[in-house]
Amino acid sequence: MTAYAAIIGTKDNPVYELEMGPINEKLDRSLNSHLNQFIVHSSLDIVDQLQWTSNAFYMKTIDQFHEMYISAYVTPSNMRFMLLHQNQSADNIKLFFQELHELYIKTLMSPFYQPNQPIRSQAFDLKVRSIARRYL
């Protein structure tokens, strides 16, 4: 399982990033990390176009890069949840996004968090990793 999840803010800034999967060498991890960020960021234009043509929060596979697929989920507050993944079940990806959205809402309700700022909470990270293990 190789996947990269990101929460992108309303100003196209990364709020949270998570890389999952086996990569052994540091150099490969660094190059892979930058490539994942580039692929997801380049797909934001597609998400911006699709969000005006659909009422659904979840957008299945919006783009593809080699054997990797990009799925998206747009919240009512225009936060974009992006997932770069190998071919997975669309239902599992949708459930992953829904639980991530619930977790993000709980974070938003914290008086110590400002919207569009990076999420650095270890508890948030552990919960997202748990959700990812369950569905991805």
From Swiss-Prot:
The keyword Transport applies. CDD domains: TRAPPC2_sedlin. Transmembrane segments: none annotated. It comes from the Eukaryota. SUPFAM superfamilies: SNARE-like. Keywords: Cytoplasm, Endoplasmic reticulum, ER-Golgi transport, Golgi apparatus, Transport. GO terms for cellular component: cis-Golgi network; cytoplasm; endoplasmic reticulum; nucleus; TRAPP complex; TRAPPI protein complex; TRAPPII protein complex; TRAPPIII protein complex. It is found in: Cytoplasm; Golgi apparatus, cis-Golgi network; Endoplasmic reticulum. Disulfide bonds: none annotated. The keyword NAD does not apply. GO terms for biological process: endoplasmic reticulum to Golgi vesicle-mediated transport; intra-Golgi vesicle-mediated transport; intracellular protein transport; macroautophagy. Belongs to the TRAPP small subunits family. Sedlin subfamily. Component of the TRAPP I and TRAPP II complexes. TRAPP I plays a key role in the late stages of endoplasmic reticulum to Golgi traffic. TRAPP II seems to play a role in intra-Golgi transport. This is Transport protein particle 20 kDa subunit.
